[in-house]
UniProtKB/Swiss-Prot annotation:
GO biological process, one term: single-species biofilm formation
Inactivation phenotype: Decreases biofilm formation.
Species of provenance: Escherichia coli (strain K12)
Protein name: Putative inactive recombination-promoting nuclease-like protein YjiP
Highest taxon of the lineage: Bacteria
Length: 103
């Protein structure tokens, strides 16, 4: 089993579970909007390297990147796990920064 370094044990637990294809597929079947589920072939999920995320960002969150076949071609599903113990008025900007790192 892969060991992950994270600031909270909750992040490590979710990241460990969501790096398993069957668990990730079940999670996405439950949580992705129907329109997106219908576009994606979740049986084609492939775990990708998240090494593109710089060390400063890596210290702030746990991230998982899955590639997936879609009706339109290849695509990606980026899972960001962020447990907050208090309100963060800048959360939307932080999530945007994480997403931009993937691009």
């Amino acid at each position: 089993m892969t060991n992950f370094t994270t600031s909270t044990p909750h992040d490590a637990l979710f990241k460990t579970f969501l790096t398993h294809p069957d668990t990730a597929r079940d999670f996405m079947e439950i949580h992705l909007p129907k329109d997106l589920r219908e576009l994606c072939d979740l049986d084609s999920l492939k775990l990708e390297s998240a090494s593109f995320v710089d060390e400063k960002l890596r210290a702030l969150h746990s991230d998982i990147l899955w590639s997936v076949k879609t009706r339109e071609g290849d695509g990606y599903i980026y899972v960001v796990i962020e447990h907050q113990s208090r309100e963060d008025i800048h959360m939307a900007f932080r999530l945007m920064r994480y997403s931009m790192a993937v691009m």
